């Protein structure tokens, strides 16, 4: 399994690049539009990769950061979401915007991605609602845990999100206490 490739970009297209390693091996790697915008031909970089082996192809998908790679890997595990659709999500939404859409149940944001309709957006949200903590960084994880706890207490997500915008606490326990005071 190839988990990362370091080398010089010898070819760059909007969603594809070729990386030549110091050993002379060149790898063709599919990339998101966001990744493409941040790299230049002739530049030495390291791309984290997800490798997909098929009967007719050995495909590499490249990412500049771990969050985008995790987002891609979570998406391709879902029934009916292939690598091309997952890359379309990576190209259309940052990992933070994607996470926000999952947390808020925002199908409108997900349907802006080519190839994702309302039904698929609802399924993505439903299937990833438990896995969203994997995508979160430390600053978001306590908010996700707080939202989950408050929902378990019977509060509605939209009301919780509005209250959390005005909360200042930086850990789960304090944020739950602060939110409960404002929700009461």
From Swiss-Prot:
Q: Pfam families attached here?
A: HHH_5, RuvA_C, RuvA_N
Upper taxonomic lineage: Bacteria, Pseudomonadati, Campylobacterota, Epsilonproteobacteria, Campylobacterales
Let me see what the UniProt entry remarks about domains: Has three domains with a flexible linker between the domains II and III and assumes an 'L' shape. Domain III is highly mobile and contacts RuvB.
Summary of the function given for this chain in its UniProt record: The RuvA-RuvB-RuvC complex processes Holliday junction (HJ) DNA during genetic recombination and DNA repair, while the RuvA-RuvB complex plays an important role in the rescue of blocked DNA replication forks via replication fork reversal (RFR). RuvA specifically binds to HJ cruciform DNA, conferring on it an open structure. The RuvB hexamer acts as an ATP-dependent pump, pulling dsDNA into and through the RuvAB complex. HJ branch migration allows RuvC to scan DNA until it finds its consensus sequence, where it cleaves and resolves the cruciform DNA.
CC terms in the record's Gene Ontology section: cytoplasm; Holliday junction helicase complex; Holliday junction resolvase complex
UniProt-annotated stretches for the region Flexible linker: 145
Q: Which HAMAP family match?
A: DNA_HJ_migration_RuvA
Region labeled Domain I — which residues?
A: 1-64
What organism is this sequence from? Campylobacter hominis (strain ATCC BAA-381 / DSM 21671 / CCUG 45161 / LMG 19568 / NCTC 13146 / CH001A)
Q: Which family does it belong to?
A: Belongs to the RuvA family.
User: Which terms in the Gene Ontology molecular function aspect does this entry carry?
Assistant: ATP binding; four-way junction DNA binding; four-way junction helicase activity
Q: Show the SUPFAM superfamilies listed in the entry.
A: DNA helicase RuvA subunit, C-terminal domain (SSF46929), Nucleic acid-binding proteins (SSF50249), RuvA domain 2-like (SSF47781)
The segments labelled Domain III in the record are 145-184
Q: Assembly state and interactors?
A: Homotetramer. Forms an RuvA(8)-RuvB(12)-Holliday junction (HJ) complex. HJ DNA is sandwiched between 2 RuvA tetramers; dsDNA enters through RuvA and exits via RuvB. An RuvB hexamer assembles on each DNA strand where it exits the tetramer. Each RuvB hexamer is contacted by two RuvA subunits (via domain III) on 2 adjacent RuvB subunits; this complex drives branch migration. In the full resolvosome a probable DNA-RuvA(4)-RuvB(12)-RuvC(2) complex forms which resolves the HJ.
Q: Under what name is this protein listed?
A: Holliday junction branch migration complex subunit RuvA
Please, one GO biological process term?
DNA recombination
Keywords assigned: Cytoplasm, DNA damage, DNA recombination, DNA repair, DNA-binding
